[in-house]
Curated annotation (Swiss-Prot):
Residue span of region Disordered: 82-115
Recorded superkingdom: Bacteria
Organism: Bartonella vinsonii subsp. berkhoffii
Domain Peripheral subunit-binding (PSBD) span(s) in chain numbering: 111-148
Catalytic function, reaction form: N(6)-[(R)-dihydrolipoyl]-L-lysyl-[protein] + succinyl-CoA = N(6)-[(R)-S(8)-succinyldihydrolipoyl]-L-lysyl-[protein] + CoA
Cofactor names: (R)-lipoate
Lipoyl-binding domain segment(s): 2-77
Any one annotated GO CC term: cytosol
Polar residues biased stretches: 101-110
Keywords: Acyltransferase, Lipoyl, Transferase, Tricarboxylic acid cycle
GO molecular function annotations of the record: dihydrolipoyllysine-residue succinyltransferase activity
Protein known as: Dihydrolipoyllysine-residue succinyltransferase component of 2-oxoglutarate dehydrogenase complex
Highest classification ranks of the organism: Bacteria, Pseudomonadati, Pseudomonadota, Alphaproteobacteria, Hyphomicrobiales
Pathway(s) per entry: Amino-acid degradation; L-lysine degradation via saccharopine pathway; glutaryl-CoA from L-lysine: step 6/6
Functional summary from the UniProt entry: E2 component of the 2-oxoglutarate dehydrogenase (OGDH) complex which catalyzes the second step in the conversion of 2-oxoglutarate to succinyl-CoA and CO(2).
Length: 411
């Protein structure tokens, strides 16, 4: 008896997906609830599990195919088990026992990430030389860099042993090698959506960016004094994102236009704050949403940001986790960015960019002092938000961070 495998419901407004990878081959045994195939939507990656135990009987949708919700992907034959082909005696006698590293690599069916594959090709590193740290053992760029840092021996190109006489190589023979320096990789659904949405935001909104700078001394001092006690009581580390989210929520109460959106000829003002927190992953940028952030304590915000961040990096975010945001915060500072002009996350009317904290000489009470400074950037939709409102919003965020007591006193 065969059981059909169909595309599950992928969430509100998501009608199709791309078949990313089949984890099993035809005839291979599968356990109940074992992932069979990976689907890529324009928002998340979804694994479709096997509803029964048996073997993969049929594959209908090939890797790279676009499928709609409830479309037939394949079928599993319930109760059947695949039979592994036993190696011949000659093969057994010739093949040496694989090392632990080779066993780990051979069992990994995930192809290396494109950036990792490029580095491996450039440095003549075999897949068997690397243990992947990504999802299901996928080799990531960081894994290759770690191997290179350890000085792994690369595999040199094979040289014919039939002659020791140097052989001249014509330019025509080099040409195919030069062509291999480029790589064409199909864009994932997520990357296509990122590209489309960012360009649509630029084309639709009257986008403008205003800047300010903030002295992080107060926040850093507060964090240093209470980080151990905070973690002991709440079970989560005290980071910077919690302070920024609280400061943003505080400023949005005073300037609701920055938390609004346009719908046709109407402006919708939101009396709540669903803060989108931009998270970088191997497959692209995603923006999970901290719902009702304005009603949360600092500890609750930090816990929710941590939870969503882990789901994002593991590729387990649900579509609902990324819907309904009213304002976005992005922190390019974790990558070393000194300043940027963030692009709006439509249909939102504002996005705040945080950046690297750098010690700079500042004039404080007529004296030169070294202070940890950060540039802030607010990109906003000028159709809704006036310049005065945008500047005031950024000043309020600055004031809350330089004097965190204002958040407690609601000033």
């Amino acid at each position: 008896m065969t059981t059909e495998i169909r595309v599950p419901t992928l969430g509100e407004s998501v009608t199709e997906a791309t078949v990313g990878k089949w984890f099993k081959k035809l005839g291979e045994a599968v356990a109940i609830d074992e992932p069979l195939v990976e689907l890529e939507t324009d928002k998340v990656t979804v694994e479709v599990p096997s509803p029964v135990a048996g073997k993969l009987f049929e594959i209908i949708a090939k890797e790279g195919d676009t499928v709609e919700v409830n479309a037939l992907l394949g079928a599993v034959e319930a109760g059947a088990a695949s039979v592994a082909k036993s190696p011949s005696s000659s093969e057994t006698s010739v093949s040496a026992a694989p090392s632990e590293l080779e066993q780990s690599s051979s069992s990994n069916t995930m192809p290396p990430a494109p950036s990792a594959a490029k580095l491996m090709a450039e440095n003549n590193i075999a897949k068997s030389d690397i243990l992947g740290s990504g999802k299901r053992g996928q080799i990531l760029k960081e894994d290759v860099l770690n191997v290179l840092a350890q000085g792994v021996k690369t595999s040199p190109p094979a040289v014919s042993a039939s002659s020791s006489t140097p052989v001249s190589v014509s330019s025509s023979a080099v040409a195919p090698v030069q062509e291999m320096r480029e790589e064409r990789v199909r864009m994932t659904k997520l990357r296509q959506t990122i590209a489309r949405r960012l360009k649509d935001a630029q084309n639709t909104a009257a986008m403008l960016t205003t800047f300010n700078e903030v002295d992080m001394s107060a926040v850093m001092g507060l964090r240093k004094r209470y980080k151990d006690l905070f973690e002991k009581k709440h079970g989560v580390k005290l980071g910077f994102m919690g302070f920024f989210t609280k400061a943003v929520c505080h400023a949005l109460k005073e300037l609701p236009a920055v938390n609004a959106e346009i719908d046709g000829t109407d402006i919708i003002y939101k009396n709540y704050v669903n803060a989108g927190i931009a998270v970088g992953t191997d497959k692209g940028l995603v923006v999970p949403v901290v719902r009702d952030a304005d009603q949360m304590s600092l500890a609750e915000i930090e816990k929710e940001i941590g939870r969503l961040g882990r789901l994002a990096r593991d590729g387990k975010l649900a579509v609902s986790d990324m819907q309904g945001g009213t304002f976005t915060i992005t922190n390019g500072g974790v990558y070393g960015s000194l300043m940027s002009t963030p692009i709006l996350n439509a249909p939102q009317s504002g996005i705040l960019g945080m950046h690297a904290i750098k010690e700079r000489a500042m004039v404080v009470d007529g004296q030169i002092a070294i202070r940890p400074m950060m540039y802030l950037a607010l990109s906003y939709d000028h159709r809704i938000v006036d310049g005065q409102e945008a500047v005031t919003f950024l000043v309020r965020v600055k004031e809350s961070l330089e004097d965190p007591e204002r958040l407690v006193l609601d000033l």
